[in-house]
């Protein structure tokens, strides 16, 4: 599914329109001295919903980062969505990061599962199991399974996903959006080699998150 994203994500258009109208009205009534906080708010909303194009690495076995942010976990963990032991890499997004999600690999969507939940701080490990989340399980052409989980955060209360089971995904393709501070967990096959470390800042699509193992 090719979901068209302009440089300002369309998820943000209503918020930008509302912020702009409020700023204009207050400016018209009270001048810039009264309206400047609302112009500042408009600038923040526009930067939050920015969605710039990114360079996409072509390395065949690369798993690309699905979101902008900071690495908060690199560990062996159980993937409950594909029922396996896996390498788990987690990316935390603060309110200043781009909040669109992009496919980490080329492949076909095996399933999409939504789970209601809490809205804990997404930087916490327990957010992976307790927060509202949406899992997309992808099968690559080489037979690997990659799971990408969108997780709502303390402020984020809306997960958007634009793909369904059976649809193809291309690496770097935009497939979802989380509003206002969140997290993405990626589960990879055992034997995958992480290319990032905890605390590292990463960029969606242009950062290589890990390398998949060769199929036997």
From Swiss-Prot:
It holds the Pfam family PS_Dcarbxylase. The record marks 181-182 as: Cleavage (non-hydrolytic). The modification Pyruvic acid (Ser) is found at residue 182. Pathway: Phospholipid metabolism; phosphatidylethanolamine biosynthesis; phosphatidylethanolamine from CDP-diacylglycerol: step 2/2. Heterodimer of a large membrane-associated beta subunit and a small pyruvoyl-containing alpha subunit. The keyword Lipid biosynthesis applies. Is synthesized initially as an inactive proenzyme. Formation of the active enzyme involves a self-maturation process in which the active site pyruvoyl group is generated from an internal serine residue via an autocatalytic post-translational modification. Two non-identical subunits are generated from the proenzyme in this reaction, and the pyruvate is formed at the N-terminus of the alpha chain, which is derived from the carboxyl end of the proenzyme. One of its GO terms (biological process) is phosphatidylethanolamine biosynthetic process. It comes from the Bacteria. GO terms for cellular component: plasma membrane. Keywords: Cell membrane, Decarboxylase, Lipid biosynthesis, Lipid metabolism, Lyase, Membrane, Phospholipid biosynthesis, Phospholipid metabolism, Pyruvate, Zymogen. The gene is psd. Signal peptide: none annotated. This is Phosphatidylserine decarboxylase proenzyme. InterPro entries: PS_Dcarbxylase (IPR003817), PSD-A (IPR033175). Catalyzes the formation of phosphatidylethanolamine (PtdEtn) from phosphatidylserine (PtdSer). The keyword Lipid metabolism applies.
